[in-house]
């Protein structure tokens, strides 16, 4: 059961402090189309958690209404090993876009799970295509993650800090939506992948931007 965000806000107003960061699937796909114009197919990488299943359902609904010409392949951690995933990405051409959501794999030892950020970096360095993501976790780090459409880490930190300060000051809880969301791109990866900076939207937040870039 998916409870609407506004219903939660109304029911728990003043009792909880929540920092809410939406996932911008529609805007992410539009950005991918803009930066990789030949894209006719999408590989959406996710795992078996409930939130991943919800993202796949949202993706199916959005592509049906807004991107009906786009063929979507759902690459799910339960259906293949990480090596199989990397091998699959090697066989896709430039017409295939790659969007990463999550790839949690259960460890062979106990019930622990391997952090998906490691897989994200491995995938970004192995894939022939630029790797787009849905949050600012691995952009501007030692990876080949290109970026995506979401709030920056600085924006998230700002809202979390405000929520903590209000709580420590004894103020009633509040619900905050992290803003603004915008295209976020690693300039070095952009150049390595052969994508023209001229294709970037005017409101793009650019990591590693050269001093002479306008």
Model-inferred region functions:
Residues 1-214:
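Short hydrophobic alpha-helices and adjacent helix-cap/hinge residues
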């Amino acid at each position: 059961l998916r409870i609407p965000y506004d219903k939660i806000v109304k029911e728990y107003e003043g009792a909880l402090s929540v920092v809410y960061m939406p996932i911008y699937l529609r805007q992410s796909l539009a950005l991918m189309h803009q930066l990789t114009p030949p894209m006719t197919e999408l590989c959406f990488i996710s795992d078996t958690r409930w939130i991943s299943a919800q993202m796949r359902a949202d993706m199916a609904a959005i592509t049906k209404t807004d991107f009906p010409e786009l063929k979507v392949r759902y690459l799910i951690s339960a259906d293949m090993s990480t090596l199989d995933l990397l091998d699959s990405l090697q066989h896709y051409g430039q017409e295939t876009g790659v969007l990463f959501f999550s790839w949690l794999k259960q460890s062979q030892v106990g019930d622990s799970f391997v952090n998906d950020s490691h897989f994200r970096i491995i995938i970004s360095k192995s894939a022939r295509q630029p790797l787009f993501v849905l949050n600012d976790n691995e952009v501007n780090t030692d990876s080949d993650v290109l970026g995506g459409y979401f709030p920056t880490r600085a924006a998230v930190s700002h809202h979390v800090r405000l929520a903590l300060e209000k709580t420590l000051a004894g103020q009633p809880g509040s619900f905050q939506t992290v803003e603004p969301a915008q295209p976020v791109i690693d300039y070095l990866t952009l150049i390595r992948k052969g994508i023209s900076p001229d294709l970037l939207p005017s409101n793009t937040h650019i990591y590693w931007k050269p001093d002479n870039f306008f």
